Amino acid sequence: MKQGIHPDFQKVVFMDSATGAKFLAGSTLKPEETVDYEGETYPLVRVEVSSDSHPFYTGKQKFAQADGRIEKFNKKYGLKK
């Protein structure tokens, strides 16, 4: 590995803007804002969506398009409910 070409890896706190949930993880991002987390001071990265607020992970998914496709298939092939 070449020396001096890799970005610095550090621990940062990711905060979900929608829910306020905080996650500690490693990153090469260098934010200017800091936050106290579990007694330590870490750089803070604000994110709009995380696993705490994304519909796939919260179980609040909507399958609106799938219903339309099924109805179209049933109409095309004459299947009834």
Swiss-Prot record:
One GO molecular-function entry: structural constituent of ribosome
Assigned GO CC terms: ribonucleoprotein complex; ribosome
PROSITE patterns, A to Z: RIBOSOMAL_L31
Record's keyword terms, sorted: Ribonucleoprotein, Ribosomal protein
One Pfam family it belongs to: Ribosomal_L31
Superkingdom per UniProt: Bacteria
Listed GO biological process terms: translation
InterPro entries: Ribosomal_bL28/bL31-like_sf, Ribosomal_bL31, Ribosomal_bL31_B, Ribosomal_bL31_sf
PANTHER family in UniProt: 50S RIBOSOMAL PROTEIN L31, CHLOROPLASTIC, LARGE RIBOSOMAL SUBUNIT PROTEIN BL31C
Assembly behavior: Part of the 50S ribosomal subunit.
Family label: Belongs to the bacterial ribosomal protein bL31 family. Type B subfamily.
Annotated protein name in UniProt: Large ribosomal subunit protein bL31B
Species annotation: Lactobacillus helveticus (strain DPC 4571)
Gene this protein is translated from: rpmE2
